[in-house]
Every structure is written in C-alpha cells, then in structure tokens.
Design a protein with these regions (language model features):
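Conserved acetyl-CoA-binding loop-helix of GNAT-fold acetyltransferases
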Residues: 115, 121-134, 157-161
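Conserved catalytic-core motifs of GNAT/GCN5-like acyltransferases
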Residues: 147, 160-182
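Conserved active-site alpha-helix within GNAT-family acetyltransferase domains
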Residues: 126, 138, 151-168
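Conserved acyl-donor/pantetheine-binding loop and adjacent beta-alpha core of acyl/acetyltransferases
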Residues: 86-112, 120, 174
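Conserved GNAT acetyl-CoA-binding A-motif
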Residues: 129, 136-148
C-alpha cells in the first residue's frame, strides 16, 4: 500500500504543459465543465448502442469524489477543458484478476476517459493519451491499465493504436445494476 500512496503523491506533480495544451489536476470549480465532457461521452455511447455510462454513473458525485481524492484530471486547450480522465494508482476490481495483468505494484489506472464532442477526430484524444503515457514514463510507472466495454469498438481501436495490449474480460463492481459490468482489460508497458 505504501507504493500506491507514493504513486498518488507522484501523480500530484501535474500539470504537464505542452504548448497551449495542458494536462492538470482538476479542481472543484471545474465540475460543471467536466460533467459536460462526460455528458458528451454518455451521448456518444448511447448513439452507438453501448450500455456503458447510461444509468447515472459517472455522475457529479463521482467527479466530486475524484477531485477530493485528487484523481480527477482535465486536458485543457487554450484554457478550455477538452478532455477528462480519472487517474489512480490502484483499482480494487483489477486486483481481483491477478492472473491477467503483468505482475507489478507500480501501475497507473485510467478511468472515465472522455473528450469533448467538438474535439473528436482531431487528434486531441491521441495527444491526451500520449501526455498521460509521457507523464507515467517521467514518474517511473511500469504499466498503464484501462478497461472498456466489449462493444466500444472505437475505444478498442484507439487503445490498440496507442499500443495497449488486449488482455481478457473482467467484471466491474458498478454502483447501478443497469449498466453492463463486463469489460475488456488492456495494459501498456511503459518503456
């Protein structure tokens, strides 16, 4: 647990600025903008017929909790929030599947990754992920872990393009009983 706490301290070293794009820790004044990006993501998933994020979660209380836990991050372009993600050094659901992941105590988990609809298909999502990967590398993180719905073909292709390795199906503990709980797990070795 000490390693995970240390990593959370390391994660707090953001912001990471590149030109007019910045990855930084979110604050409570940004909840409305973050929820707008998440709402865009929910609508996008609904249009694709994907039963993920459709029944309340992630909601405002999730983002508020992420901010309190210092795990909520935003991606800004010229001061405008164009993306959001929850970055953490631990995931209890992932720990239930020790045989699918590479054995390691120093990993970063990405959840609630979303890009504002006006910025999709413009390379922002790819740049966002590259900056998260660069940040992980600079902080000696060994692996990045993420999961997505099996029907989310766009994100699955996105993860493959970013060199994530598809592992296996996992089942998440989700608050609501209406969203599908099965996800495909992915992992990226930071080199």
């Amino acid at each position: 647990m000490k390693v995970r706490w240390l990593l959370l301290k390391i994660v707090s070293k953001l912001p990471k600025k590149v030109g007019n794009i910045m990855l930084k820790k979110a604050n409570s004044t940004e909840i409305e903008e973050i929820m707008s990006v998440i709402k865009d993501g929910k609508e996008f998933l609904k249009q694709q017929g994907i039963n993920q994020w459709q029944h309340g979660s992630p909601g405002c209380s999730d983002v508020e909790n992420d901010i309190k836990q210092e795990t909520s991050y935003v991606y800004e372009l010229d001061g405008e929030i164009v993306g959001t993600a929850m970055l953490n050094a631990y995931d209890a659901d992932y720990e239930k599947y020790p045989t699918i992941w590479t054995k390691c105590n120093n990993y970063l988990v990405i959840h609630r990754l979303a890009v504002k609809k006006e910025y999709r298909s413009q390379g922002i999502g790819h740049k966002f992920m590259n900056d998260i990967i660069l940040f992980a590398k600079e902080n000696s993180v060994e692996y990045i872990r993420i999961d997505t719905h099996k029907d989310n073909v766009i994100i699955r292709k996105y993860l493959s393009k970013n060199n994530f390795k598809e592992l296996d199906e996992i089942k998440l503990s989700i608050k609501n009983s209406l969203d599908d709980k099965e996800r495909i797990a992915y992992e990226l070795k930071i080199e």
